[in-house]
Amino acid sequence: MDVLKITPRGYCYGVVDALTVAKRAARDESIPRPIVVLGQIVHNRYAVEELDRHGILTLDGPDRLRLLDEVPDGATVILTAHGVSPAVRERAREKGFHVLDATCPDVTKTHVLVRERVAQGYHIVYIGTPGHPEPQGAMGEAPAGRVTLVSSLAQANTVDLPEGPLAIMTQTTLSQWDTADIIAVLTARRPDAEVHNEICLATQLRQEAAVKAASGVDVVVVVGDPRSNNSNRLVEVVEKVGGTPAYRVETADDLRPEWFTDARRVAVTAGSSTPSQITRAVIGRLESWNVATVPDA
């Protein structure tokens, strides 16, 4: 069995920037303590545990506004790479917290776009994953009733599309193929809609590389946290677009030999929030199973 290491894989620049903000804060003794991250800074528990070793506390939960009530007075609050709504920012200011913003620049771009189009009278159709913090933050830029979340092709066919200017926007970590299908349905219903496909370049490149590699292997392993949207989408695109069985693992201990019983070639990739040492351990485990490594894709 050969192992193909797909590139690019692992941390994107948005994740690197977010972790840099947090670690720099930990080193800066002038910053108020405690330092608290409002939600997981990125969706990977090993990245969160690393911050814990730097003395940074993570408060996690589905409602960022409620999490602020758990932050001690006088603390420093770090906003995660996924972004937050204006209501969260305002509440943090009201409570007097020292706020550090680790929002990914690509996510910030979408926030700005939502604000601009709402000010111009547009209704926003946002394609995203329900319950994920990125859509929650971006959609929070629009007043109630001015934004609609669409998460599936079926919903795209039936969702109410209000009259007047309409702008379609997307979460940055979706499957580019599924998103294209949803956009096609929406624009068929509303040819006048303005489309802004905000899937980030890092997500696109990782998905395209994984699909390309899938055509030449028997199994693809995606290393990523269960909560990582981009990792889960990598599994989906490999199976749906690449036509190859794919498995997501959090660590090397999740690997199952029976997945590779008839496999002669295996490819490994990782989500954009997966630490490289975790991916290396997965590759090392596979190599220990009688593997001859081939060059990177």
Identify the role of each PLM range.
Residues 1-297:
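The feature marks the mature, well-folded catalytic cores of soluble enzymes
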